[in-house]
Amino acid sequence: MTATAAPETNPAFHLSGEALMGLRHLARRGVTPATRTLAGLPGGIVTKRRGRGSEPDDVRLWSEGDDRRHIDRNATARTGILHVRTHHDERDRAVVLLADFRPSMLFGTRRALRSVAAAEALALLGWRVVGDGGRVGLVVAGADEPTALRPAGGERAMTAVTGALASAHARALAQPAAADPPLDALLTLARSLLPSGGHLVLASALDSPGPDFDRLLTLLAESLSIRLILVSDAFERSRPPGFYPFALPDGRRGTVQSARQAAREPAPARLAADERLADYARRGIAGLRLDVEAGPEAYAPLMERLDAVL
């Protein structure tokens, strides 16, 4: 799948701000006030935060078992029926989404480009964050100057984020083929947009991240919460046997052979992705693998899990 072969309206290649805006309904599906108090704790189990929180959330009818201390006097006096006020945690979450649109991300063999999948996942996460009262910012890595938006809250912030993603992606597709610039400087830029204790979520295949990337990422993890969305194309995980032509940004061309793999043998690329995530997890940087072919419906529960630990 090549970026130049598709019409401008093909969603597999071209990001639409309207489509990313539409993901807000998918992102918020099934989210209730009870689930908005999930705590991000280490390990695979998500639990509720203790206590009732400090921020007013909603007023509802009294039900058996409710604490009488939470009775809302105004609503009760107005209706003559007992009402209670619910609360949620006061969390000022500032999250910067870092989208990798460098030339290596403009690749895909099923459903969409890796860059499109990265943007879809980040948009889903962004809608969840602002829906819970958090603030979302953006940094986009490409072959040209990066895009940066400071964290802000509400639908207006996500309108800016989705528009910036679509615009930056269109610029990336229009750029001539080039080598990937390193991601090191983009980490520094993202850090400058966040307060200490903020959250950075990076969506990338991490091809050619730069010689100083791992060291800098580990260093930043001491003051920020960092999460990785490792984007993976099906062809990388399981290549059918055969000969595959390739072309490099510097003009060199050639052919690579993919040998037949035993049916029970795990795909090396899949192992490499999982091992890479495990290595980052040992340094306190948790992450997940995002399969490009799965699509936003499958990404939504993944982003729900990721949101719970931010």
What does each model-found stretch correspond to?
Residues 2-45, 61-66, 71, 75, ...:
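Exposed, interaction-prone extracellular/peripheral surfaces
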